[in-house]
Regions:
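Feature recognizes metal-dependent phosphohydrolase scaffolds
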Residues: 1-286
């Protein structure tokens, strides 16, 4: 693990990770694509959980597994165990950025509603607290006089993130999916371009993608047929047991002791039943 407390190093990792994200050879517009060789590991919301991140690194073992890729999203806005504890999810964010720099061909990040809200200054409250303010205070606690410089690097990083990933075997991965009521107005061309300010604002298709909820099995099936998808993997909605299934949709959570992740062999087709059976719990990782 790197020393996350050095502002210059943190900014360096964040700036480099942002550039790698923008220039990713797997990326066209706002979509990452993966072929039919190797493995992709999909995670759920992580919200500052360093323990599960360390287990993810051990499982992926990228230093000896060049054919394995890993996708992360929603890293920030940790839920403190007590009201007087700081949100230090900046630590996870910097660790993941450093991992991206170390393994640029293996580590991938997607846009999420919390990262987007922090970038846009759009308030989110949990239990009466402002998670944006708590995150900024955590950055100030960690980096003191250099906090604003680090925050600028954080926002550059958030602005660089793609929206989704798709595999040759029919798996679509994103932070969430549009609300069913927005299906008819959702602009699917958003995946083909760099997201604009309008895309990322309320009413935009990128915003709709990362904030969507209320997905029924029928709605998921409709979207699967429309987009030619075998299975959707997302996060966004909290899952106390680690995951939930809604038809072709699997919702993963990686931010607590019952958190999960999902390894996918890219060389074969999967049913959703098979994908569900492949879900791994972080507690199973030594």
């Amino acid at each position: 693990m790197i020393d996350v407390t050095v502002a210059e190093a943190a900014c360096g990792h964040l700036h480099e990770a942002a550039q790698l994200s923008r220039d990713d050879p797997n990326r066209t517009g706002a979509l990452l694509t993966f072929g039919s060789a190797g493995q992709v590991v999909m995670t759920g919301d992580m919200h500052g959980h360093l323990g599960n991140f360390k287990k993810l690194q051990r499982f992926c073992a990228l230093e000896r597994s060049p054919g394995r890729s890993v996708i992360l999203h929603e890293l920030i806005h940790q839920e403190p165990e007590a009201s007087d504890q700081p949100d230090l999810s900046i630590d996870l964010l910097v660790q993941v950025a450093a991992w991206k720099c170390q393994f640029p061909d293996n580590v991938f990040l997607l846009q999420s509603n919390h990262e987007l809200a922090q970038l846009r200054g759009q308030e989110i409250t949990k239990g009466g607290r402002s998670v944006l303010r708590d995150f900024e205070q955590g950055v100030a606690l960690r980096y003191e006089a250099q906090a604003e410089t680090v925050l600028a690097a954080v926002y550059e990083y958030f602005a660089s993130l793609p929206l989704a990933a798709r595999t040759a075997n029919g798996v679509f991965m994103s932070h969430s999916l549009p609300d069913p009521l927005a299906f008819d107005v959702f602009d699917e061309a958003v995946f083909e371009r760099e997201p604009t300010a309008d895309d990322l604002a309320p009413g935009g298709s990128a915003y709709s993608l990362v904030w969507g909820r209320f997905h029924s099995a029928d709605a998921v099936e409709y979207l699967a047929q429309r987009w030619g998808v075998e299975a959707f993997l997302i996060g966004h909605t909290p899952q106390e047991d680690g995951y939930a299934r809604v038809g072709r949709l699997l919702i993963l959570a990686s931010d607590h002791a019952h958190g999960v992740f999902l390894p996918i062999d890219l060389s074969r087709k999967y049913t959703v039943d098979e994908l569900e059976r492949n879900i791994r719990k972080f507690v199973s990782v030594e």
